[in-house]
Amino acid sequence: MSTDILRKIEAYKREEIAAAKARVALDELKARTRDQSAPRGFLKALEAKRAAGQFALIAEIKKASPSKGLIRPDFDPPALAKAYEEGGAACLSVLTDTPSFQGAPEFLTAARQACSLPALRKDFLFDPYQVYEARSWGADCILIIMASVDDDLAKELEDTAFALGMDALIEVHDEAEMERALKLSSRLLGVNNRNLRSFEVNLAVSERLAKMAPSDRLLVGESGIFTHEDCLRLEKSGIGTFLIGESLMRQHDVAAATRALLTGAEKL
């Protein structure tokens, strides 16, 4: 996403946030978070897969995207969540942004309720209010996109997530953002292989930025990962955790496609 697109997204997000605050006061939202069952442990689920010698997959539930349009016409979040779990995914990522991705909060809640996997709210966050929203919908983890927030806001979002018992996935796409991300406390770092200006995808981005991360961080490869071979390639750079959406969303048998991606087993 270009800087211009990120600016447009921030503009409509800030309108959304203002409207949401007018509908549900922060105190009411905080009360709703207390009604939720405890977070499931997003980072813990990823680490358990890696400790067992397996690739750890954050499997994404995504109906559409700004660049590709409609990705999955037959869109059933609970069924997709079950298929991902059956295929061996460690966690879910669910789009809740409506204008750009045709996502919705209900998709997150329904998907998480249909399985035992922890779930990430995949959205553009600009206000701690959205972290409370995420928890009130059942999310176990939030996404912080370093390209769209300054350091102070990134820390405020992270602190809010941690106070709610959630994890935070910090997304970077270049060296400068990686340096900023390493000042935060979260051990979960996502490297987006998509150039936000040209939209080009190159796995070499993950390979390059992986060298900057200390060994105590869990690196997540994002974008441009389509095959088991792609996973094996990134593993050579110390990345064994992946966030994958579109390539799996386009498959008829999502469980079999997930299994094939993770293990190299042929799809039946």
Curated annotation (Swiss-Prot):
Gene name per UniProt: trpC
This protein's record includes keyword Cell membrane: no
Pfam families: IGPS (PF00218)
Recorded metabolic or biological pathway in which this protein acts: Amino-acid biosynthesis; L-tryptophan biosynthesis; L-tryptophan from chorismate: step 4/5
InterPro entries: Aldolase_TIM, Indole-3-glycerol_P_synth, Indole-3-glycerol_P_synth_dom, Indole-3-GlycerolPSynthase_CS, RibuloseP-bd_barrel
Organism: Brucella suis (strain ATCC 23445 / NCTC 10510)
Catalytically driven reaction(s): 1-(2-carboxyphenylamino)-1-deoxy-D-ribulose 5-phosphate + H(+) = (1S,2R)-1-C-(indol-3-yl)glycerol 3-phosphate + CO2 + H2O
Name the record gives this protein: Indole-3-glycerol phosphate synthase
GO molecular function: indole-3-glycerol-phosphate synthase activity; phosphoribosylanthranilate isomerase activity
